Structures are given as C-alpha cells and as structure tokens.
Amino acid sequence: MSSWIRWHGPAMARLWGFCWLVVGFWRAAFACPTSCKCSASRIWCSDPSPGIVAFPRLEPNSVDPENITEIFIANQKRLEIINEDDVEAYVGLRNLTIVDSGLKFVAHKAFLKNSNLQHINFTRNKLTSLSRKHFRHLDLSELILVGNPFTCSCDIMWIKTLQEAKSSPDTQDLYCLNESSKNIPLANLQIPNCGLPSANLAAPNLTVEEGKSITLSCSVAGDPVPNMYWDVGNLVSKHMNETSHTQGSLRITNISSDDSGKQISCVAENLVGEDQDSVNLTVHFAPTITFLESPTSDHHWCIPFTVKGNPKPALQWFYNGAILNESKYICTKIHVTNHTEYHGCLQLDNPTHMNNGDYTLIAKNEYGKDEKQISAHFMGWPGIDDGANPNYPDVIYEDYGTAANDIGDTTNRSNEIPSTDVTDKTGREHLSVYAVVVIASVVGFCLLVMLFLLKLARHSKFGMKGPASVISNDDDSASPLHHISNGSNTPSSSEGGPDAVIIGMTKIPVIENPQYFGITNSQLKPDTFVQHIKRHNIVLKRELGEGAFGKVFLAECYNLCPEQDKILVAVKTLKDASDNARKDFHREAELLTNLQHEHIVKFYGVCVEGDPLIMVFEYMKHGDLNKFLRAHGPDAVLMAEGNPPTELTQSQMLHIAQQIAAGMVYLASQHFVHRDLATRNCLVGENLLVKIGDFGMSRDVYSTDYYRVGGHTMLPIRWMPPESIMYRKFTTESDVWSLGVVLWEIFTYGKQPWYQLSNNEVIECITQGRVLQRPRTCPQEVYELMLGCWQREPHMRKNIKGIHTLLQNLAKASPVYLDILG
C-alpha cells in the first residue's frame, strides 16, 4: 500500500509522460520503412541490410509527407526504379539524394508535383540514360550525376549543354560509354544531327487597340526535329493556334486591355534542349476609373483612386464643378504604377470645412475619357452640428479661390449663398464673438498651465517624473516575445531622460519596442509541445555575448538529433528568475516552437532543470549579417587581419535579400510583426544561408542603432516608418518599411542608415518624407523596390509576397557562387 502511495502525484505524471514518449518513438519508427530513419522533415535510408527495394513511402496517419523537405538514400543496391507516383506525396521536397545505389530508371513524370525541388544528387548509380523532360519544369540549382554509366547518345546531349551553360569551376566530370564500350568525357561528345533547336517569331507591330485582332507567325528548326508550342501565360483574350512540325500561327481575337504588357512566346523543344522567341503585347484603350472612395486620414487626407488606361491618361480634378488648381497643399500623387494601372490619391494637407464638397476626377487620353465624383466631408462647419447641411440658406460664407486655398476658379462665385434674414445674421455674429472670446480664454488658460509645468520641469533632474515615464502596456499590437519585467531589463532610471524624443512641442508617445515578434495567447497553437532538454546534455564551450536578458553561449548538445551524436548550438540563459520572467520564458518558448521555417533560426527547446533557465537555438557559423556584410565589403581591409575576405557580389547580395524576404513572408502568413528587422538581427550560416533571429544581444552590441526614450524605451528609429515613430503603430506594413532599409544595408555592405545624421535629425528626415539614397552597388530595380517599401502611406507600400517574388526573380537571373565562405 505504501509503495502505491509513493507513485501518486508528480512521480506518476512523469511515468505517464515517459510512456507516451516511448509510444511516440514507437509510432514514428513503425511508420518508417525498414532500413530507414524518419523525422518530421527528413527521411534517410543508409543501412544496406536488409535494404529497400522501392522508393520509401510513409505509412498513413504517420508523419505528414508534405512536411518532408529532404530524402537521403545511400547503399541501396536493390533500389532500381523511381515510379511516377513514388515522389508525388512529398510536395515540399527540396533535396533528393540517391547515391551508391542501383538506380537505373526514372519515370518521365516522377517529379511532376515536386516544384520545390532544388537539389538532386544521383551520384554513382546505374543510369544509362536520363531525359531532360524529368527536370524542365523544375528550378534546380544543383543536379549531380557523377559516376553513372551513361550511353553516348543524343538523349544525354542536354546534360553536356547544361554543363557548358554553367561554365563554373565546379563542373562535373561526366563520362559515357560509346559503341566500343570506351569511356569518353561527356564534354568531348559529338553526336551528328543532334543540336539545340531555334525559334523565330515573325512579329508584326504588337501595339494594338482594345477589341481588335492580331495573328502571330512562328517557325522552328533543328535536328532532331523540334516540337513547337505557344506559351501565352495567363492570356485573357480568346486565342487559337495552328501548328505543324516547323510552322505555326497564333490568332488572338477581341483583345482585352487586361492583356497589355503580357509576354507571348514561341517555343521549340527537342531532346537536346529548347529555344524560344518572345514579344510583348501592348494594348491601347480608353481610360476607366475603377476605384474612387471617400477621403481617408493618415498623415495627410487622401481621396484614393485607381485609373486604368493606355496611353497614360491625363488626370484633372474638379471641385464643386470648377477646375481645381493644384498646389503643394492639394495635389495628385501616384503611388503605384502597374503598367496600365495607376494607384494614387488626391492629397490634401490639413483640409478644413472650407474643403468640404464634391470632387470629380476626369481621366482622358486619345481613345476616350471617364469621370467619377465623390462627396468629401473633412470637418464640421462653425456654428453648425457636424452632421448638419452646410448649404443651409441662413448660413453666410465667402467663396474661396485659388489665392486662399488653391481650389477652384477665382472668378467663380457660384459657391456664395446670400443671406435671407438680416436679424439672424446679426445674432450669429454676436454668437461668433462669444465663441471667439471663450476659445481665447481656454487657450490662454492652457498656456498658463503649460508654462507652470515647464517651470516645474526645470527643477527636476530629468525633466519628467513618475507615471509619465512608465511604459504603456496597452499597445495596439501584442505583448513582446522577449521578457520585460517591470522595466528591469535596462539599468537606467525609470525617469525620462533629457534625450527623450521631442518633435515640435510634443513628446512622442512610444512604448518598449521588443526585439522580436508580438504575439497573443490566442495565436499559440493549443497543442504546442516544447521540447525539454536535459542539462547534462548541454556542454558550454564559450561565451558569445550578453544581452539584457542574460548571457549567450556556444555549446555542444548531445542526443538532440538522431543522425548526430552531438551538434553545436547557441544557448540563451535567463538571468532574472522572477515568476513573471519564468512565465514570459515559457510563453516565448511556445511561440518559438510554433515558428518553423528554413529562414527563421531553428529553436530546439528549453532546459528548466535548476537555474538559470536555458533556451537552445541552432548555431549559425558566421554570426550576425551586419558583421558579415562589413567583413565582406570594400572596407574589410581596414578591419581584417591578414588577407581580407572576398568582397560580396551583387548576385550574392540578392541571394541574401530574397532569403530574408522569404522569412518575412512566413512571419506575415503567421500574423506576426517583427518590429525590429535589421541585418544585426539576421544570422549567417554555411553556404550563405541567412535566417531571421536574434538572442537579445543586439541592443548591447549595436547600442548606437537604438535611441533611448524616457529611460526605458529603446527604438530602432533608423529602421522605422513615420507611423511607428509618431504613433507607435507596428504592422506588417511597418515591417515592409524595415525590409526596405535592410535591403539598403545589404547593398551598402552593412552601413548604418542615415549614418551622417543624429537621431533627432533622422526623425525629422523620416517624418518629413525623405528617403535613403540609392547605394552605389544597388541595381535600379532593387532601389525601386526600396522606394516601394518606403511609401509614406502604409497601404501604398509593396506587398511582402510581391517583394519576395521580385527578389527571387532577380536572384535567379544572377547565378550565385557560394565559395565566399570558404
């Protein structure tokens, strides 16, 4: 009986936990094929006994195959075939390795559903032939075929062509067996009547009016005789084609304006490869105003509109039927141009009741015109309730022309409404006088109070006392990921310092800007399971740095990954052991467990056995991106000891940028706002792999990048948009602004934004609409992307997915060589 009692409580809970853990490992092992090991994202089969005879497949209701990103197979002599349906379930697969095995045949459509494949390694197998049709839809960065007994034929000439196109020092040594069973280098292979095809598009003038029709003709040539097809993308207009072996035509009828700017290609394809000839379609059409809405208030009032038309329409605004003469106070701004579509707004600087009225937009070009009208109400009329009709006949007001408000025609008196009651007029005049006296009295009283407070402030050491310096917890975004315990994270006083940010006479309402993402409890997955790591499995090696929350160490962690006995990790310790600190610690661990992405630093788990509490992250060999950029820039010779590292190329910068953008796309999809995106908070691993993440050290190491406000608050103002500086508003759009600054950092090799200006000067520049200049090494397309990130109006900034797509396309156009890391 006494032994049963001893198993109650925590001991029994631990026993049940151990049993579930054993069952979990048993299920994972049972679901994995014999001779293989499986994890949530990887399958590896390297045991030759008993080995596998077919491509590994996961059992139903086990690990989701869509999450598998890597499959590694080695020493499987009985694996000979990859069938069409063997790989289709692994839609997230990025790396496929089959080496030292018996692979002889790959079905033509084996990789049809694996569009994410980037690396394929078929080294030392039994392949005698391999068609390019397997891979033509894939964007492969690596295809390794060394050690296969290829037969010399036209079927493998595409591999030779691919090798010649790469022309890099790491070109593979490939051979094939000729008719005499002699091994000859693939680079020397010559096959008669076996060459690349050619395509020639005889395009007429492809500038056509909407609703018209056009015919394109194309001829192809080559030996082997190529197949010909048309690539029309997502063409909206009705089209039909006629093709023979070497000739073809494409008829497009009733051409739609939606097809303007689209590319049409004629493609010739044979065994060796493909060629294409393309033209761009330009459609001229009359303007249409597709969007005109009531004014919205941000930093300025804006009447938003969208206009389509080609050629570009001329825009003219009318106010209450009269031409609106634009000025610096009222002007048309085009924020985004998408070929034939223009998104913008009529911007009004501090409009009053005098600007209320009907606004008409007219757009016209040589093909026609369109107009739309919107009623705008900015402010209530003096002496009238805000919802009353300003055109009430007893109200007297004067016409306002261009000289006063830059609106309308100075000769137009149509806005005047004559008085119909002299007595009412006199009464209202008396009422106006009383109103002015009351307002003047209130203003005078406020000035006296302000002077009194300023006098008191002079006698205070810091100019600000008590509650005014307390950090607000009613932020419009969620609470910070990193621990904040009653302001104890910083050694400074709780009183506001003399360096508090001042704009004009108003102190900016700011809050603690966390190092990482904001999150609410509702965003955490209910089944979040944080991995717990035994303290004896963590062996500290050396200190990497110290942040506000504790020290960060390089360590070895044992029994963390099944394929490795030990791995290098970075561990973050928590020096504050208070109850609040521990709650925030566990909350952060749950958040990090939910964030799983190739460009977010991997979180392995926690160690809570004793103090200090520890978080375990993957270790990134080359440290933070800012230091890496500086070490591989033109000024590296000033900092390096001995031979300086190789300078980063433009293509490598694009490779870095698109990885960071990919991480930000993921965070946006998870509804997280980073709020401190900068190169100092990105880490660099091997092969130029970049991930978003930090360990709470950046505010100590990069203290000049932050601006202390009121003693507690540290703001990265050089990376912040106007709405974040002035209104403490952090959104995905504010992250987009920061991403634009990160691009600027990358192309300046890690320079500090606005390095020539003080913090107050930076605030003034950003709030006045100035932007960073184009770096010397930055392509124009990338700088235009930066400008798209730095639009003053948040809703006008580029979409994060669009940014990633553009950077990805630019990176693909520039091949990246990763030997910079040695």
Swiss-Prot record:
Q: Tell me the residues on which Phosphotyrosine occurs.
A: Y516, Y702, Y706, Y707, Y817
- Note one Pfam family from the annotation: LRR_8
What's a GO cellular component annotated to this UniProt protein?
Answer: plasma membrane
Region annotation Interaction with MAPK8IP3/JIP3: residue ranges? Answer: 455-466
Disulfide bridge positions per record: C32-C38, C36-C45, C152-C176, C154-C194, C218-C266, C302-C345
Extract the SMART domains matched here: IG, IGc2, LRRCT, LRRNT, TyrKc
Task: List, for all copies, the residue spans of the domain called Protein kinase.
Answer: 538-807
Q: Which UniProt keywords apply?
A: ATP-binding, Cell membrane, Cell projection, Cytoplasm, Developmental protein, Differentiation, Disease variant, Disulfide bond, Endosome, Epilepsy, Glycoprotein, Immunoglobulin domain, Kinase, Leucine-rich repeat, Membrane, Neurogenesis, Nucleotide-binding, Obesity, Phosphoprotein, Receptor, Repeat, Signal, Synapse, Transferase, Transmembrane, Transmembrane helix, Tyrosine-protein kinase, Ubl conjugation
Question: Reaction catalysed?
Answer: L-tyrosyl-[protein] + ATP = O-phospho-L-tyrosyl-[protein] + ADP + H(+)
Q: Name one GO biological process term.
A: glutamate secretion
The residues covered by the LRRCT domain are 148-196
Q: Which residues form the active site?
A: D676 (proton acceptor)
Enumerate the Cytoplasmic topological stretches. 455-822
Sites marked Interaction with SHC1: Y516
Give residue spans, biased composition: Polar residues.
485-495
- Region (Disordered) location: 475-498
Q: Which GO terms describe its molecular function?
A: ATP binding; brain-derived neurotrophic factor binding; brain-derived neurotrophic factor receptor activity; neurotrophin binding; protease binding; protein homodimerization activity
What does the PTM comment of the record read? Phosphorylated. Undergoes ligand-mediated autophosphorylation that is required for interaction with SHC1 and PLCG1 and other downstream effectors. Isoform TrkB-T-Shc is not phosphorylated. Ubiquitinated. Undergoes polyubiquitination upon activation; regulated by NGFR. Ubiquitination regulates the internalization of the receptor.
Per UniProt, subunit arrangement is:
Exists in a dynamic equilibrium between monomeric (low affinity) and dimeric (high affinity) structures. Interacts (phosphorylated upon activation by BDNF) with SHC1; mediates SHC1 phosphorylation and activation. Interacts (phosphorylated upon activation by BDNF) with PLCG1 and/or PLCG2; mediates PLCG1 phosphorylation and activation. Interacts with SH2B1 and SH2B2. Interacts with NGFR; may regulate the ligand specificity of the receptor. Interacts with SORCS2; this interaction is important for normal targeting to post-synaptic densities in response to high-frequency stimulation.
Family membership, please give it: Belongs to the protein kinase superfamily. Tyr protein kinase family. Insulin receptor subfamily.
Any extra detail in the entry? Answer: Trk also stands for tropomyosin-related kinase since the first Trk was isolated as an oncogenic protein which was the result of a fusion between the tropomyosin gene TPM3 and NTRK1.
Q: What clinical condition does the entry mention? A: Developmental and epileptic encephalopathy 58: A form of epileptic encephalopathy, a heterogeneous group of severe early-onset epilepsies characterized by refractory seizures, neurodevelopmental impairment, and poor prognosis. Development is normal prior to seizure onset, after which cognitive and motor delays become apparent. DEE58 is an autosomal dominant condition characterized by onset of refractory seizures in the first days or months of life.
Query: Which protein is depicted?
Result: BDNF/NT-3 growth factors receptor
